[in-house]
């Protein structure tokens, strides 16, 4: 009996603690997508013409997080058969990313978008060993040689590709990009900012389900009116 008397306060204290903790767990708050988002003008967050959903990315070729996310983005795009809209957003503190983006634009416009993607992938793979613009040029030169391409002495004599990179960066500033990579899954009607790369597939699944659930626009057959003459 004495033991029971000693145990009773312990049991009561344990039950009290459980009751105190339970409401806290029940009220655990889970943030919603885009909650507390700081994006400003989101008008550009649309898939390309003809696509219902896409991955929209602002990236910096000198950014380690971009290098880690790049293959996952491509795997997701291939898995779901959806396009990637890729924007250059070279950060001010990075010494060679802007020039590398210009080389990527050269390859995209002069060779092919696929070759530009391969170049970006090569730059990300070599990123840790690039400490200067000279290092970046060595990697670029090696890329051209291994792909059987003639490397121009001046890739952008008219400044066209520089303007394209600057236009992308201006779009990022307009959107309010504060870090790279900035990954967003977009449809014609909404977008979700993916702040954790691990949630990319789940986000695509969610938005793709919404897109598939949308009623298809009924095709209206124009009615031909008979032409009468007075």
Regions found by a protein language model. Give the residues of each.
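A short beta-strand-turn-helix
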Residues: 35-53
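C-terminal cap of thioredoxin/glutaredoxin-like
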Residues: 141-230
């Amino acid at each position: 009996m004495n033991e029971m008397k000693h145990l009773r306060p312990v049991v009561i204290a344990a039950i009290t603690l459980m009751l105190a903790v339970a409401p806290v767990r029940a009220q655990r708050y889970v943030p919603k997508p885009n909650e507390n988002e700081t994006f400003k003008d989101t008008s550009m967050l649309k898939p390309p013409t003809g696509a219902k959903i896409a991955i929209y990315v602002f990236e910096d070729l000198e950014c380690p997080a971009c290098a880690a996310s790049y293959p996952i983005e491509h795997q997701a795009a291939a898995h779901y058969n959806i396009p990637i809209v890729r924007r250059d957003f070279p950060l001010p503190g990075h010494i060679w990313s802007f020039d590398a983006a210009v080389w990527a634009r050269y390859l995209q416009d002069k060779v092919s978008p696929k070759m530009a993607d391969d170049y970006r992938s090569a730059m990300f793979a070599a990123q840790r060993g690039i400490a200067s613009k000279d290092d970046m040029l060595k990697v670029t030169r090696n890329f051209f040689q291994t792909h059987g391409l003639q490397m121009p002495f001046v890739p952008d004599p008219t400044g066209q590709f520089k303007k394209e990179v600057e236009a992308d960066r201006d779009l990022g500033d307009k959107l309010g990009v504060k870090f790279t990579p900035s990954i967003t899954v977009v449809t014609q009607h909404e977008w979700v900012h993916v702040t954790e790369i691990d949630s990319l597939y789940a986000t695509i699944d969610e938005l793709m389900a919404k897109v598939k659930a949308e009623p298809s626009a009924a095709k209206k057959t124009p009615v031909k009116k008979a032409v009468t003459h007075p």
